[in-house]
Amino acid sequence: FEDFNPSPLAAASIAQVYSAKLKDDQKDVVIKVVRPGIKNTILSDISLMRRIANFAEKKFEDAKRLQLSRLVSEYEAVILSELDMRLEASNIKQTKRNFEGNDLLYVPDVYLDYCSENLLVMEMIEGIPVDRLETLNDLGVDLKLVAERGVEIFLKQVFIDNFFHADMHP
């Protein structure tokens, strides 16, 4: 990278997001970095959840009926897939293909050559978060139209594409 800002743009439990500039073509990008050691922490937490679920299923009929162990296994599969930035890159690329030629949604480019299991690099897009209502109102943004388009995007993903990608920002 030509330039890398060490102050995160955003931080969540699994990853942090930074801004940078590519060395090759000077494009502004965002870099999503999986937190070091988070996989081991998650695996430890899942192990504890599994032990609690197994215990509860032996002691309580409702826990057995709710299939808590199965629920933990499903959660494990989902959360571990969220740790792989290559899978997220692939999902973003698929979403971009699904919305090609559609002006409802702009999906940023992913720079696959820079991506790895713990790193996602994608085009920097400037925008205003939808929760900044005062700013959007000041700019005259039609919030009803934004909501309608959000629903349309969701419905297209679910019922037309049969592919839903919810993490639309790094």
Regions found by a protein language model. Name each.
Residues F1-P170:
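Conserved catalytic cores of large enzyme domains
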